[in-house]
Swiss-Prot record:
Molecular function in Gene Ontology: ATP binding; ATP-dependent protein folding chaperone; unfolded protein binding
Protein's recorded name: Chaperone protein DnaK
Membership in a protein family: Belongs to the heat shock protein 70 family.
InterPro entries noted in UniProt: ATPase_NBD (IPR043129), Chaperone_DnaK (IPR012725), Heat_shock_70_CS (IPR018181), HSP70_C_sf (IPR029048), HSP70_peptide-bd_sf (IPR029047), Hsp_70_fam (IPR013126)
Region ranges (Disordered): 605-624
The gene coding this protein: dnaK
Annotated Pfam families: HSP70 (PF00012)
Entries under PANTHER family matching the protein: HEAT SHOCK PROTEIN 70KDA (PTHR19375)
Length: 639
């Protein structure tokens, strides 16, 4: 059985870890970094992921995707998506099923399809380290992700060629990373997770007793559209507004300028965590009829804090709700853990400290803790980690729409998973032969204000007066927090088939097609790599041949020289194309045409060898003619 890897699929950065010698180890990617930017770029002939994608973003803004996790499992008309539509340099579109998709070079792509590229890089990083194929993974998601978002994340894993053994909540994973080595005792831990695109708070009880550890999530809350990207956007908008005041030009209409502005804003935000002021300096940011324009704006830490103050305050309300749901007060919390890169901001740390009345722990790496926890959970599933029990919860209530468009809850939020619940329903009209059960997720009483997960149609009900047929619907939430539904007609005892017509998400056929596309792209990537290798070898051959021609000088007959030059030109032409066989053929012909060069080089080498031999003989002869002379030492006092 191969290793199960742990992946933190983040909004801004992603990370992969694996158990190595019983300890979770965060792996370095091909660029030598322990975290990988969650950025994907599409060019004419390849897909670029991570730091290389980030570096080329300024020159390719409309085909470079970042923060794609904010779109996963979401509808195009969602308010959160509409906010991003207006600020992202790339195109967000409405799919046929109403989902939010993206478009690059005329290709429409689902967020799970794009996210799969990041997962493929994480998979490759692990395979390079382990020296074997990896097919199984534990992937983390924000605790407040709904059913659609969790299912979409599993779809991304499948498209990347991974069997997702478990979906685990990010704060829970961080608590695992923190608590796995802790000794005896019972601790209440608050995990404050403010990442690139999402915010979660989880209250977790860690019970360590005689080597056994139980991690029980007591309550969770959050906001799946609040994170570092929103902090960046506040700064981006401020800079764009200031520039418009000074120059009268709106940078928001220029994707290239916006991409440069985004990079500069992110850099300035990070700098202001360790310094009180910085300067954003972007020469030639745009131009008009009067010439090029430059952006130079000074920003203080206080200014940044004033821009994002309401965002920080927005994180405090979920803290209050989570504590209330757990039936705890602030004083009951023993430790506070900060997770996510945005928690490095001093103002965020100050807000958390003031709320809990204690300093957060500094011994947890906010960028790596989640991946470490995922690797530990992978170890639990594979049997490599013993005596650890993880009890997670469903973040949102699940129920159905009943008469009067009211949501009736079957499973309350913060219920430990896996769990099941059933309820008996009946017909609303006489002789009704079918019922439609509308499944919802959320906390609102009004059905339409909650997330629609789908409609379950039950046909073939025997004619009877209203209220008489008894149809038992069962909700079953698995350990991934994903809902499964079945229904039984209690009169016949037969289980009826229910088709879940999801209001959004990818169908099984779409996922299967994307898996096939990914496999096809893997072959394309391999061919592209082989093509680049052939080009590089051909370029090296031409360079070496030119050098040999120069060294041969007049010793190379003009007829041979012309043949070699023609062969080199043929190689140059071939390397400009995309035919590997043509490049290899032209390279072979150049090698054959250069046969005379090899003869000249060998003759020259032999001549040099002969000259060295003669020189050696002469030196020996000269040595034989040397006469030993008598000498007398002259003392200073004889002078």
């Amino acid at each position: 059985m191969g290793k199960i890897i742990g992946i933190d699929l983040g909004t801004t950065n992603s990370c992969v870890a694996v158990l190595d010698g019983g300890k979770a180890r965060v792996l370095e990617n091909a660029e030598g970094d322990r975290t990988t930017p969650s950025i994907i770029a599409y060019t004419d002939d390849e897909t670029i992921v991570g730091s290389p994608a980030k570096r080329q973003a300024v020159t390719n803004p409309t085909n470079t995707f970042f923060a794609i996790k904010r779109l996963i499992g979401r509808r195009f008309k969602d308010d959160e998506v509409q906010r991003d539509v207006n600020i992202m340099p790339f195109k967000i579109i409405q799919a046929d099923n109403g989902d939010a998709w993206v478009e690059s070079r005329g290709n429409k792509m689902a967020p799970p399809q794009v996210s799969a590229e990041i997962l493929k890089k994480m998979k490759k990083t692990a395979e390079d380290f382990l020296g074997e194929e990896v097919t199984e993974a534990v992937i983390t998601v924000p605790a407040y992700f709904n059913d659609s978002q969790r299912q979409a994340t599993k779809d991304a894993g499948r498209i990347a060629g991974l069997d997702v053994k478990r979906i685990i909540n990010e704060p829970t994973a961080a608590a695992l990373a923190y608590g796995i080595d802790k000794k005896q005792g019972d601790n209440i831990v608050a995990v404050y997770d403010l990442g690139g695109g999402t915010f979660d708070i989880s209250i977790i009880e860690i019970d360590s007793n005689d080597g056994d550890q139980t991690f029980e999530v007591l309550a969770t809350n959050g906001d799946t559209h609040l994170g570092g990207e929103d902090f960046d956007n506040r700064l981006i908008n401020y800079l764009a507004d200031e520039f418009k005041k000074e120059q009268g030009l709106d940078l928001r209409k220029d994707p290239l300028a916006m991409q440069r502005l985004k990079e500069a804003a992110e850099k300035a935000k990070i700098e202001l965590s360790s310094t009180n002021h910085t300067e954003v300096n972007l020469p030639y940011i745009t131009a008009d009829a009067t010439g090029p324009k430059h952006l130079v704006i000074k920003i203080t830490r206080a200014k940044l804090e004033s821009l994002v103050e309401d965002l920080i305050l927005r994180t405090l309300e979920p803290l209050k709700v989570a504590l209330a749901d757990a039936d705890l007060s602030v004083s009951d919390v023993n430790e506070v853990i900060l997770v996510g890169g945005q928690t490095r901001m001093p103002k965020v740390q100050e807000a958390v400290t003031n709320f809990f009345g204690k300093e957060p722990r500094k011994d947890v790496n906010p960028d790596e803790a989640v991946a470490v926890g995922a690797a530990i959970q992978a170890g639990v599933l594979s049997g490599d980690v013993k005596d650890v029990l993880l009890l997670d919860v469903t973040p949102l209530s699940l129920g159905i729409e009943t008469m009067g468009s009211v949501m009736t809850k079957l499973i309350e939020k913060n219920t430990t998973i896996p769990t099941k619940a059933q309820q008996v329903f009946s017909t609303a009209d006489d002789n009704q032969s079918a019922v439609t059960i509308h499944v919802l997720q959320g906390e609102r009483k009004q059905a339409s204000a909650n997330k629609s997960l789908g409609q379950f149609n039950l046909d073939g009900i025997e004619p009877a007066p209203r209220g008489q047929p008894q149809i038992e619907v069962m909700f079953d939430i698995d350990a991934d927090g994903i809902l499964h539904v079945s229904a039984t007609d209690k009169k016949t005892g037969k289980k009826q088939n229910i088709t879940i017509k999801a209001s959004s998400g990818l169908s099984e056929e779409e996922v299967a097609q994307m898996v096939r596309d990914a496999e096809a792209h893997a072959d394309e990537d391999k061919k592209f790599e082989e093509l680049v290798q052939a080009r590089n070898q051909a370029d090296g051959l031409v360079h070496a041949t030119k050098k040999q021609v120069e060294e041969a000088g007049d010793a190379l007959p003009s007829e041979d020289k012309e043949k070699i030059q023609a062969a080199m030109a043929a190689v140059d032409t071939a390397t400009k194309g995309n035919d590997k066989e043509a490049i290899e053929k032209a390279s072979q012909e150049l090698i054959e045409a250069s046969a005379k060069l090899m003869e000249i080089a060998q003759a020259k080498s032999q001549a040099q060898g002969g000259a060295e031999t003669n020189a050696g003989k002469q030196a020996n002869a000269a040595a034989d003619d040397v006469v030993d002379a008598e000498f007398e030492e002259v003392k200073d006092d004889k002078k």
